[in-house]
A protein has these predicted regions:
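Conserved SAM-binding loop of SAM-dependent methyltransferases across substrates and taxa
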Residues: 144-156
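Conserved SAM-binding strand-loop segment of SAM-dependent methyltransferases
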Residues: 182-194
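Conserved alpha-helix/loop element of class I SAM-dependent methyltransferases that forms part
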Residues: 101, 114-133
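A short acidic, Gly/Pro-enriched loop at the edge of an enzyme's catalytic core
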Residues: 194, 198-208
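Conserved beta-strand signature within the Rossmann-like core of class I S-adenosyl-L-methionine
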Residues: 235-242
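N-terminal auxiliary segments of SAM/dcSAM-dependent transferases
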Residues: 4-92
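A short glycine-rich, Lys/Arg-flanked "PGG" loop and its adjoining helix->strand segment in the class I
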Residues: 222-233
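Conserved SAM/SAH-binding beta-strand->alpha-helix loop
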Residues: 166-168
Length: 299
């Protein structure tokens, strides 16, 4: 059995309600999804043992139920109703029991959600494969670290630094890194992605990854300013965010694709490419949850 299919079989066992749609997305994008899932399965089993794939499937199911519940609350309230930032920090980002299943789901959705699969295609084909040779790359809010590890797997010439505010997330990233074979080129650290007033933050990078971070911030504008400050003249940015897609820790509500686009361009970079795909919604819904990704370049 191929490594990618281990996840699909685990969903059949542990996340039956969500398995058919995940399999349909995988089958429609087999090569691309396998590019993500094959190394992920190897790293997961090498790190966490033979139960890792089933644990990931359970985490995915828990995440999907949570998203559905949050979207129902959003429909009733007419706006995001997140917890306070201190509650999010303690109950999500610093709570290992919550963060570990959350982190598994946060990477599996790229292969199993129709609204996310084009993100991983853009990430690979229009970001990673277009970076300058020997590029240095910074990932903001790296979480599980898998995007950085996939970058290292795809581009053996690049160096990557990943930062995240969540200690459990960075612990996961470092454990996966230890078995990935990329320890000489990838580093993860606990750090606020928006801390730009420190000497190390003056360094510029040829590649910056900011995947699904903006919606977690009270105000995303400083994020775009930080990206602009750190991007080298020849650099590329992979940026993504959620639109009308409520979750427990989604704080900033985007309603239109033009909103993050305008924020990016107001900070300086040019948007050279944008994709946005919607999730399936119930008839009569007020909101259409979407996932939007952009490639940014220096002007």
């Amino acid at each position: 059995m191929k490594h990618a299919e281990l996840f699909l079989e685990a969903l059949d066992r542990r996340a039956r309600l969500f398995a058919p749609s995940a399999r349909a997305t995988f089958e429609a994008n087999r090569e691309l999804c396998s590019w993500l899932l094959n190394p992920l399965a190897r790293w997961a089993e090498a790190t966490y043992g033979e139960t890792a794939i089933d644990d990931a499937a359970r985490g995915y199911a828990k995440y999907c139920f949570g998203v559905a519940q949050a979207q129902q609350i959003y429909e009733r309230a007419g706006r995001y109703t997140p917890e306070s930032m201190p509650e999010i920090m303690s109950g999500v980002y610093k709570d290992e029991d919550y963060a570990v299943p959350y982190m598994w789901a946060a990477i599996l959705i790229y292969a199993f959600w129709p609204s996310m699969v084009n993100h991983i295609k853009m990430f690979r084909d229009e970001f990673l494969r277009q970076l300058p040779r020997n590029a240095t790359v910074l990932e903001l809010a790296a979480g599980h670290g898998v995007l950085s590890l996939l970058a290292a797997e795809e581009r053996r010439d690049i160096q990557i630094e990943g930062v995240d505010i969540s200690p459990p997330a960075v612990a996961i990233a470092n454990r996966l890194l230890a078995v990935s074979g990329h320890g000489d080129r990838v580093k993860f650290a606990i750090q606020d992605a928006l801390k730009t007033n420190e000497p190390a933050s003056e360094r510029q990078y040829q590649g910056i990854i900011s995947a699904m971070l903006a919606e977690h911030l009270p105000d995303p504008k400083p994020l775009f300013m930080a990206i602009t400050q750190r991007l080298s003249p020849e650099g590329l940015v992979f940026f993504s965010t959620a639109i009308e897609s409520a979750q427990r820790d989604h704080v900033f509500e985007y309603n239109q694709e033009s909103q993050p686009l305008r924020m990016a361009e107001a900070a300086g970079p040019r948007v050279s490419r944008l994709v946005s795909d919607a999730s399936t919604v119930l008839a009569g819904s007020r909101f259409l949850p979407r996932a939007t990704a952009m490639i940014l370049r220096r002007r």
